[in-house]
Amino acid sequence: MAHGGIHLRQKRNFCPVTVSTVAVVFVVFMGVLVNSLGGVAVAADSGGVKQTPSETGSSGGQQEAVGTTEDYVNSSAMGGGQGDSLAEDDTTSEAAEGDVDPFPVLANEGKSEARGPSLEERIEEQGTRRRYSSVQEPQAKVPSKRTQKRHRLIGAVVLAVSVAMLTAFFLRRTGRRSPQEPSGDGGGNDAGNNAGNGGNEGRGYGGRGEGGAEDDRRPLHPERVNVFDY
C-alpha cells in the first residue's frame, strides 16, 4: 500500500512537455490579448477628420474657397463691371460703324444672360459649398512608428514576466516533491534486502538437507554393525 502511494505521488509530477505546452499557450493568449487591446486604444486615441468627397466624384475631395465672402463679392463685382465695360465698348464700336441696334436694352439683357449667373446666385452657391466643406467625418489614423514600438515593447515585457512566473511556479512545485523520492528508494532497498534474505534462507535449508542425507549413510543401530567391516 505504501509503494502504491509513492507511485501515485510520483505520477503527479508535471512532465516537461506539459509545462512547455501550457507556457506556450498562455504566452500566445496573452500576446493576442495585448495586441487587440493596443489596437483598440490606438484607434480610440488617434481620431482624425476627413473631408467629404466632392459632388463631381473627384478623389481630392471638396476644397474650401480661399478668402472671405467680401473678397469674393468684390471680385465678382469687378468682373461684372469689366463685363459691362466690354459691352459698352462693343456698343460704341457698333455705333461708330453705323450699325445701331434700335433696342439697346434688350441687347444688353441678352449679353448679361450669356455672361453667366447673377451675383446673388454666386453668393448662394458659395455658401452652399462652404456648408458642404465644413462637414467632417471622424476617421482612424494609422498609428505612428513610435506608438507601434511602444505597444510592442509593452507586449514583450508582459510575455517575459508571464513566462518567468510560470517557470518559477513549476520549479517550486517540483522542488517541494523531490524530497519524497528517497523514501521510494528505501522501499526498493527494503524489498531487495527481503528478497536477498529469502534467498539466503533457501540456501540454508538446502544445506541442512544435504547434511541430513550424509548423516543417513551412517548406521543408526549399533546391533547391525559388523565388526569385520572396520
Curated annotation (Swiss-Prot):
Effect of residue 218 to G: In strain: MAS
Record annotation: effect of changing residue 223 to G: In strain: Beverley, Castells, MAS and Me49
Any single Pfam family the record assigns to this protein: GRA6
Impact reported for residue 50 to R: In strain: Beverley and Me49
Compositionally biased tracts (Acidic residues): 86-100
Result after altering residue 216 to G: In strain: MAS
Phenotypic consequence of residue 185 to H: In strain: RUB
Stated consequence of mutating residue 94 to D: In strain: Beverley, Castells, FOU, MAS, Me49, NED, RUB and TONT
UniProt region (Disordered), positions on chain: 46-150, 175-230
Effect of residue 185 to G: In strain: Beverley, MAS and Me49
Effect of residue 58 to L: In strain: RUB
Outcome, altering residue 230 to F: In strain: Beverley, MAS and Me49
Membership in a protein family: Belongs to the Gra6 family.
Protein name (Swiss-Prot/TrEMBL): Dense granule protein 6
Species annotation: Toxoplasma gondii
Higher taxonomy: Eukaryota, Sar, Alveolata, Apicomplexa, Conoidasida
Gene coding for it: GRA6
